[in-house]
Regions:
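Amphipathic, small/basic residue-rich leader segments at the start of a protein or domain
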Residues: 1-138, 158, 162, 366-375
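Alpha-helix capping/hinge segments and adjacent helical runs
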Residues: 4-15, 19-26, 258, 379-454
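Flexible, glycine/threonine-enriched loop-and-boundary segments that flank and lead into catalytic domains
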Residues: 83-110, 174-203, 207-218, 385-401, ...
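Glycine/proline-enriched, intrinsically flexible loops and inter-domain linkers
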Residues: 114-145, 153-186, 209, 235-237
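Internal maturation/activation junctions in enzymes
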Residues: 143-144, 155-191, 200, 355, ...
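A short core secondary-structure module
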Residues: 201, 205-247
Length: 454
């Protein structure tokens, strides 16, 4: 039996990759394919670009089928450990990361001059979905690479040249936002940032909680830089480099699911850092951009989990016999599977429609940093920015709920066996539960999405 390939096994992915909107996306992202003279691997034209996305997706599908999926159970049981203020990943997690780095699947959306693949967000999001279908916890660690988008958008040239190549080479990232008293209400962040005149740098002091991959190489940190402020306008965003030291992991949380992903409590002791972008725009501008990327990521993770739940339910229903026939032949079971598939397909369609909107507006944003946009381009940019801003919370909210529903139904199809720990459906159920909570609860996504309707 050949190993599963998490890309080629799902024909819907190729269907979404070949959406007509991709032509405009590639044209913008590749600036009319101008890189072809500078880089060997750069595409010559649209067909060439799609072909390269297809190949990378196939490699991702293969690594996922042959390494990440078989490791998922062991990682779920072992989990990461905390020793001397550092995180030690589960052994399977290390294997997964090594495989992804060796295949060059890091900094996927970054320009080629930094060692990136210059992929649009859509094929990158497909990779995130594929990885999450095998191990949602590992999906978190790997897909946090998209924090680099925010550094690319708002950091300066010097920061670009120092940090982006490191992420493209496989270093990991985290976004340090949440605190014990600042969960959904991020304007209450208290982590203190003070300017150190003597050493010409900023210093961070305080605590962050629930930080995914909290011992990452590079952190984007939301902190209070303005003395005496209490609201979001006193917050700025900082880049902390683990090489400088000063941030330790006090503990790793013991969670219901996504065990492979270390969720950390961090202590900052005079940690050296640097400002990203302008002061006072940390929450209102930069974290909003960061969160939109993260929400798209969680939507992809949710679709991956929906797919995994459906796969497990379908396989079991075909295999399990009662009353002399496979249970899939009973209308009640068949009906459940049909509804699961409908939620999966609808959610995936919403996800990639959203990612395409994001792609067009982000590419135009990037072009605007190089030259003045034409009036037509400005119109296009505004149109897609608005669509992306309303669709992103919609995709995250709907897909996270669908993932939970599909995981629940997958266990139901398994009957008593679904309640036993040796079947994968219980891990999928536990992993799915966080998707409707983190990066903004479903209730908050509703508020964010409805703003554009009313």
């Amino acid at each position: 039996k050949t190993m599963a390939n998490f890309y080629t096994d799902i024909p819907e992915l190729k269907y979404h990759l070949n959406n007509p909107m991709m032509q405009r996306i590639c044209e913008l992202k590749e600036r009319g394919y101008e890189d072809k003279d500078k880089f060997d691997y750069a595409p010559q034209d649209y067909a060439d670009a799609i072909d390269s996305y297809d190949k990378v997706l196939e490699i991702t599908g293969e690594i996922t089928g042959e390494i990440i999926a078989p490791n998922a159970e062991g990682v779920d049981e072992e989990g990461p450990h905390c020793a001397n203020g550092r995180v030690e990943y589960a052994s399977g997690t290390k294997q997964n990361l090594d495989a992804m780095v060796k295949a060059g699947l890091n900094g996927m959306t970054m320009p080629r001059r930094f060692g990136g693949l210059n992929f649009p967000i859509t094929p990158y999001t497909m990779c995130a979905e594929i990885v999450a279908a095998a191990d949602a916890g590992f999906g978190n660690i790997w897909s946090l690479q998209d924090c680099i988008e925010t550094l690319y958008e708002f950091g300066n040239e010097d920061q670009h040249s120092r940090f982006i190549p490191r992420i493209c080479a496989g270093e990991t990232m985290s976004m340090d936002l949440t605190e014990p008293d600042a969960g959904s209400d991020l304007q209450s962040v208290m982590l203190k940032a003070t300017y150190d005149e003597a050493n010409n740098c900023w210093r961070l002091n305080g605590v962050k909680r629930f930080i995914t991959n909290g011992d990452a190489d590079l952190h984007l940190v939301l902190a209070r830089s303005e003395e005496g402020t209490k609201d979001g306008r006193g917050l700025s965003m900082f880049i902390y480099d683990k090489r400088d030291g000063g941030v330790n992991v006090r503990r790793i949380e013991n969670k219901l699911g996504i065990h492979g992903s270390p969720t950390c409590e961090l202590v900052y002791k005079n940690a050296k850092c640097e400002l990203c972008g302008d002061r006072k725009l940390g929450l209102i501008k930069y974290v909003m951009a960061l969160m939109n990327g993260a929400r798209l990521g969680i939507a992809a993770q949710s679709v991956g989990l929906s797919q995994a739940a459906y796969n497990e339910g379908l396989a079991y229903a075909k295999d399990r016999k009662q009353f002399g026939k496979a249970i899939i032949e009973f209308p009640a079971v068949y009906d459940m599977l049909a509804i699961m598939k409908a939620k999966l397909d609808a959610g995936r369609a919403l996800l990639y429609q959203t990612s395409r909107y994001v792609d067009i507006y982000k590419a135009l944003d990037d072009i605007a940093r190089e030259r003045k946009l034409t009036p037509e381009e400005r119109q296009e940019q505004k149109k897609y920015a608005k669509l992306a801003d309303s669709f992103t919370p919609l995709a995250k909210g709907m897909n996270s709920e669908y993932a939970n529903q599909n995981a629940y139904d997958s266990i139901q199809i398994h009957g008593g066996s679904g309640f036993m720990l040796e079947y994968a459906c219980q891990r999928i159920y536990r992993d799915a539960r966080i998707t409707s909570i983190y990066e903004g609860t479903t209730q908050l996504q509703t508020v964010a999405a409805i703003r554009y309707v009313t």
